[in-house]
């Protein structure tokens, strides 16, 4: 039976870039990877309710000591920054204590969280933990993503669905999600919902479009422009009058 690979890792170096961008001597690599892991673990824990979709880490050479540039993508920048930057400054202080290096902390707002796979998966997990129907949660998530400009969406929820004795998987799909096309910008994320019946696994695939030569992922993820409003439908009386007038 064929297994699906992670679409994010499959496209690294082709249309996607790495979330950790730095070079180091071979002996220093394990320590730096562990440092990146601790930074992400801390930020995801502190900003659990802030809708964090991605954390990018770059390492820069400074005059006195090395600097780490952390870019956090979030749907709720107000929660990350806090009043007068209080929450952000506290996070910077904690990270500098953790790494013993200077931290440059940037916050980027995610304009359309409805079509970002990581945020869709997090939102689905939150609803499932609040005892929402797994079918309804998936259908609403797909509709919102398509309305926001996604070309295709696929979801899968696994576990003791509805409290059933036997675990199973159930998913929904709408639009195109070409997993074998390497130029296809497919965003993929997973999440866990901790319910009274056990843990439910959530997988989300979102197709944004194809990255053609000379383009980048940013071109396929431009803000979606709403289409022109649909004409209003006439009521039955107006429609009958219109038909009679045409006949006469």
UniProtKB/Swiss-Prot annotation:
SMART domains linked: KH
InterPro entries: KH_dom (IPR004087), KH_dom-like_a/b (IPR015946), KH_dom_type_2 (IPR004044), KH_sf_prok-type (IPR009019), Ribosomal_S3_C_sf (IPR036419), Ribosomal_uS3_bac-typ (IPR005704), Ribosomal_uS3_C (IPR001351), Ribosomal_uS3_CS (IPR018280)
Key words, A-Z: Ribonucleoprotein, Ribosomal protein, RNA-binding, rRNA-binding
GO biological process: translation
Entry-linked CDD domains: KH-II_30S_S3
Region called Disordered, residue ranges: 222-248
Record-level GO cellular component terms: cytosolic small ribosomal subunit
Gene3D superfamilies membership: 3.30.300.20, Ribosomal protein S3, C-terminal domain
Gene Ontology MF, one: rRNA binding
Family stated for the protein in its record: Belongs to the universal ribosomal protein uS3 family.
The protein's role, per its UniProt record: Binds the lower part of the 30S subunit head. Binds mRNA in the 70S ribosome, positioning it for translation.
Quaternary structure (record): Part of the 30S ribosomal subunit. Forms a tight complex with proteins S10 and S14.
Name this polypeptide is given: Small ribosomal subunit protein uS3
Organism of provenance: Alteracholeplasma palmae (strain ATCC 49389 / J233)
Chain's gene name: rpsC
């Amino acid at each position: 039976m064929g297994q699906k690979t992670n679409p994010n890792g499959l496209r690294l170096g082709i249309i996607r870039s790495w979330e950790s961008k730095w070079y180091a001597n071979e002996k220093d690599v394990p320590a730096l990877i562990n440092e990146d892991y601790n930074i992400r673990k801390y930020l995801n824990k502190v900003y659990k309710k802030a809708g964090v979709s991605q954390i990018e880490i770059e390492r820069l050479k400074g005059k006195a000591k090395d600097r780490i540039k952390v870019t956090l993508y979030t749907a709720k920048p107000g929660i990350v920054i806090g009043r007068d930057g209080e929450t952000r400054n506290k996070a910077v202080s904690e990270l500098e204590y953790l790494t013993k290096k200077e931290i440059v902390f940037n916050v980027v707002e995610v304009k359309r969280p409805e079509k970002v796979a990581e945020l869709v998966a997090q939102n689905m997990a939150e609803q499932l933990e609040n005892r929402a129907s797994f079918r309804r949660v998936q259908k609403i998530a797909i509709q919102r993503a398509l309305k926001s400009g996604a070309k295709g969406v696929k979801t899968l929820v696994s576990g003791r669905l509805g409290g059933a004795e036997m675990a199973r998987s159930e998913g929904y799909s709408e639009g195109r999600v070409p997993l074998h096309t390497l130029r296809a910008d497919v965003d993929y994320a997973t999440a866990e919902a901790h319910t009274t019946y056990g843990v439910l696994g959530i997988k989300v695939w979102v197709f944004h479009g194809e990255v053609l030569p000379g383009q980048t992922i940013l071109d396929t993820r431009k803000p979606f422009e709403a289409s022109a409003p649909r004409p209003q439908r006439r009521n039955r009386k107006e429609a009958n009058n219109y038909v009679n007038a045409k006949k006469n």
